[in-house]
Amino acid sequence: MLSRRNPQLNNHGELIHLLSTEGLPRAVLTQILDTASTFLSVNDRDVKKVPLLRGKSVFNLFFENSTRTRTTFEIAAKRLSADVINLDIAKSSAAKGESLLDTIANLSAMHADMFVVRHSESGAPYLIAEHCAPHVHVVNAGDGRHAHPTQGLLDMYTIRHYKKDFTGLRVAIVGDIVHSRVARSDIHALTTLGVPDIRAVGPKTLVPGDLRDMGVRVCHDMAEGIKDADVIIMLRLQNERMSGAMLPSAGEYFKSYGLTADKLALAAPDCIVMHPGPINRGVEIESTVADGAHSVILPQVTFGIAVRMAVMSIIAGNDA
């Protein structure tokens, strides 16, 4: 998806859009994580605001349903003191047949400063970034199967928070990887940050073999895939993106690939368990694990606000 010149960066190598973790230099990833750390304390203040985006208009354009991502983006923008506009797609002109670019052109005429976009079509945020005015910034909140960069970044923040260093880590990503934009964003970021052992775990129908070309170890046996893992990232089954019988049943899937306390015992003693949500208990993870001592699923949500604040504040401060 990336052109020869990375469209996310200006000529000085500064971040002006966030479209994917693919192709982002380690220095940019580290800048985002370091900046997020400075925003964590804002959550604990009586007045949870900083003035960095005061006077800026942020438009949330969610063409797909979302709870955590949309809410945390709205909270993040408001804590940066931005004016936030949530476009109701079902009631907008897009529902009447208006093209994506016409929608963007009209919103740009309202002096938008930033678009946060979730879309079912891979590449939609790239298209918007290519056609919007130079002063307008675009953040990809998930596009098709392609990328979910802020989820990838908050996952990296979570890993760094608990593990301190990426070198030497063993990270297992388990579940429906073939349909997962989160998995792709995580793999690109983990690779750039120097994680030497990345594993993709799941049935053959849900794990693309070409991940091996990215240096990922593909495992179809759960026990092998999570053995001695320092980090386990569980993914839900994306039934809405599946066509045909890719799995025998949810029960059979849980038996083979659901994370239980017994299976977790195969991982490193201080392993952390992550999940981008929404969780399907009893399908990819049992409640004793999701709510247990190894789980950092709820802290991920908290960190997501700080990470999205970091992304928006950084790109808003850089010129195209």
UniProtKB/Swiss-Prot annotation:
Q: Which GO terms describe its biological process?
A: 'de novo' pyrimidine nucleobase biosynthetic process; 'de novo' UMP biosynthetic process; amino acid metabolic process
Q: Which UniProt keywords apply?
A: Pyrimidine biosynthesis, Transferase
Which reaction is the catalytic activity of this chain?
carbamoyl phosphate + L-aspartate = N-carbamoyl-L-aspartate + phosphate + H(+)
Q: Which organism is it from?
A: Leptothrix cholodnii (strain ATCC 51168 / LMG 8142 / SP-6) (Leptothrix discophora (strain SP-6))
Quaternary state and interactors: Heterododecamer (2C3:3R2) of six catalytic PyrB chains organized as two trimers (C3), and six regulatory PyrI chains organized as three dimers (R2).
Q: Which GO terms describe its molecular function?
A: amino acid binding; aspartate carbamoyltransferase activity
Q: Which InterPro entries match?
A: Asp/Orn_carbamoyltranf_P-bd, Asp/Orn_carbamoylTrfase, Asp/Orn_carbamoylTrfase_sf, Asp_carbamoyltransf, Asp_carbamoyltransf_Asp/Orn-bd
Family, as annotated? Belongs to the aspartate/ornithine carbamoyltransferase superfamily. ATCase family.
- Please tell me whether the keyword Transferase is annotated for this protein: yes
Q: Which pathway, per its entry?
A: Pyrimidine metabolism; UMP biosynthesis via de novo pathway; (S)-dihydroorotate from bicarbonate: step 2/3
This chain's protein is named: Aspartate carbamoyltransferase catalytic subunit
Q: Which gene encodes it?
A: pyrB
Q: What does this protein do?
A: Catalyzes the condensation of carbamoyl phosphate and aspartate to form carbamoyl aspartate and inorganic phosphate, the committed step in the de novo pyrimidine nucleotide biosynthesis pathway.
